[in-house]
Amino acid sequence: MFADQQSVQRAVYLALAKLARPSCAAIFEEFLLPDGRSAQSELDRRGMGPQEFVQSLLFVDGRRATACQDGGSVLITTPGSLLIRVCPGFAQVGSRLSATLVIHEALHALGLGENPPSSRDITDRVNRRCW
């Protein structure tokens, strides 16, 4: 167990509740993966829904990760990886943003890269769909 694990559990629970709404789950249709398919098509290929996929993510202590040490991120992953590193400070992020970031990282875990779309664009679009 790591320091922010309870905060992660709360964020995942709230993200799952939001993804139960079709309008929020539709975020996976909005983003295209590098091969041109939607994130939803990757979920379909895996035989999973958004909620089931979020539950498959593995959250681990990321305090030693270089990207966490710069202080600019609270969750990090590599596109296509189910491993999400939790940076110090995640517990200080509000519940709405923390759940949004879980969904944001789920999109990366399905293969979505960044720049483009920017990290802010991903987060803003998740916010619009899910809140």
Task: Identify what each model region corresponds to.
Residues 105:
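Walker B catalytic acidic pair
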Residues 102:
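Substrate/cofactor-recognition hotspot
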Residues 1-99, 109-131:
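Predominantly extracellular/secreted Zn2+-dependent metalloproteases
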